[in-house]
Amino acid sequence: MNLGIPLELALILFSVNPTFDEMTKAKEWITASLGEESYAVPFSFNYGEQSSGNFIKTWKKEYSSEKLDENRTKHTIKFSDPDTHLEIRMESIVYSDFPAVEWVLYFKNNGSSDTPILDNILPLDIGFSGDKNYKLHYAKGALCCIDDFAPMEKTFGVGDSIHLQPGGGRSSSEFMPFFNLDMGIEGILIAIGWTGEWSATFNCDSEKNLQAKAGMALTHLKLHPSEEIRTPRIMMMFWKGEHTRGNNLLRRFILSHHRPKPNNTPLVLPIILSDWGGASADHHLEIIQRIIKNNLPIEYYWIDAEWFGKMPWHENAGNWEVRKELYPQGFKPISDMLHQSGRKFLLWFEPQRVCKGTPWYELKNRPNWLLELGDGTPEYKQRGINWGISHEDPRWIIYESRRNQIAENDMLLNIGEPEARKFLTDFLSDKVVEFGLDCYREDFNIAPLEYWRHADTSDRQGMTEIRYIESLYDMWDELLQRHPHLMIDNCASGGRRIDLETISRSTALWRTDWPADSLHKQCHSYGLFQWVPLHTTAGAVAENEYDLRSSMTAGLMVQFGSDDEKTRAILDQYLKIQKYFYGDYYPLTEYNTSRDVCMAWQFDYPEIGEGMVQAFRRENSSQESIKLYPKALDADAMYTMNNLDTSASDEMTGKELMENGFVVNTKNQPGSSIIVYKKSVNKDRDYYFDGRISREVLENYLSRSITMMDLLSG
């Protein structure tokens, strides 16, 4: 693509991209750890009761590389044991547009007999030396609480350590699988791609050396002849400056390289309206007709659970017959009406949990198709859809994370069994066609870990989980290949399977099961924005401006009120600012769950010299005004600040804004303010406003429809 942009202009435009120092740091580490001559590998394992560090240098090593595209090069390193014929294949991807590298390990038995035991396989095992001030930034997971995704910190002194894992086998239950290791003026982002039970440990020794280890929480297994397994994916990214820069590099990296692409177009999240599946088709059609009649900018219509089997929904997963009393003609009349108006259809499923008494429960007669819980942990067996305890009870977190049943005798469809995976893939693929689906919503309301471990034998611990997770990725990939238009909504009790692998294929449109009110939504956004750019939360009534603004993310879910004109106005306002949610994120206040404070954040798009600040005055806050200090502005540039509510406008330099701050007044209690800022035109500096680059071209870059290389090719 030739956009007619001078090279020097493109370099000015994208000066916010990774620095030379960051790219150099990454290159040095990659050469030392992944180079053709290096044996200083970033992984470890035990084999036959010996640590890999004691023998890996004696194994045969092969190296190859392959350029995948303009920004990615694949490096493959193979280590082979001459005695047992075990082969380890490390496939890494090195990025030329980010200071990042990621890798997966594969273990294959090329021998004619079982291997010795492979134990404690850690695809990440690296050390950092020197007297540095280590601080780990990480986040809580999604546990149906007000502090879901809350930012966490751990400062390391001599002898300090921290061990993290999600609990229950869903990757973002108790903790998120993203970490920012801050070393003062530089640091490393670490992300794990494993939709099961990962673990991560950080330990500081007596000489202030820090060791970081991550992998599956349990591996103790032998491989049969010709058998192969994979590990969790590990991503590392190097940054310099403040740790918020590292998090923003991660956001940009995800948008560039780990973003779903329906119809080969980078995903921009829609405005969605949802309703319950237990309502009738006539009810849904009436709502859709209202959307069409009033030309509301709602792109997706979402039908949730209870459209199948019998009531209640949580006791009928496994009976996927459409309820004819509600939908006598199925879903095609609904999807047809949506498609004819240029809109799309989303439908809920939970196909991996199988309830007793449903047709799929009979699949237990097929060997290894359904996994049993065994004795399980009695405290983790939920009956109904609540625990009978408050969210503040310390037992809540453990019970929610590790819930192994909702309905008595729940079983787990074992997609790790090839025929079972094919059965489910074909079933879902058929429903995409039959129902006219544009988005497949996959829920997953039980923690699978105890099912997996109950199925393992003592010399194959971890194998059931490995096969299950491998097959989950294979199934999603095949669905996306068969139906290139399809979007996958990854729910899992609200946001409990968010990791580097899932966000590449799916999006969490319901990021937590506890979006109780505006306060909760603000707290959830504050935390999750720092790590993952694409997600949405529960819908707000469109006329409730405070709640709707608290719900705004890279996409938006709404519910109808009574005034369609007001609904259109606020949705139009959202569409004007939606692009900023794809920019760099900066918290401007401390994280706080209290109702008597204000919370604010900033989204900045330096590529176009624009951004916005959102401020929320909570219901018990006495602060009518708050002074905020935006980040990452051009100190010498002049900015115009526009308040979308009052139409008030002001001009200040970037330096004045960052050093002296500006005051936001919010009279309503509760209330919110949105301030949009824009660099003033200066043709000596702001070349991209002088007509040589259209706004359309810039916004194509922001949505990643084109790459930086497209610009540089001019």
Label the predicted regions.
Residues 323, 327-330, 334, 374-545, ...:
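Active-site neighborhood of glycoside hydrolase catalytic domains
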Residues 221-240, 670-678:
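Short Pro-Gly-centered flexible turn/kink motifs
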Residues 18, 231, 446, 472-650, ...:
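Active-site-proximal substrate-binding groove within the catalytic cores of carbohydrate-active enzymes
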Residues 652-697, 701, 706-709:
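C-terminal beta-strand-rich structural cap/linker in extracellular carbohydrate-active enzymes
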Residues 201-212, 643-663:
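Solvent-exposed beta-strand/loop surfaces of large extracellular or lumenal domains
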Residues 105, 226, 301, 338, ...:
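Conserved, mostly hydrophobic/aromatic
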Residues 266-426, 439, 451:
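Aromatic-lined carbohydrate-binding/catalytic grooves of carbohydrate-active enzymes
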Residues 16-203, 207, 217-219, 638-646:
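Polysaccharide-binding surfaces and accessory modules of carbohydrate-active proteins
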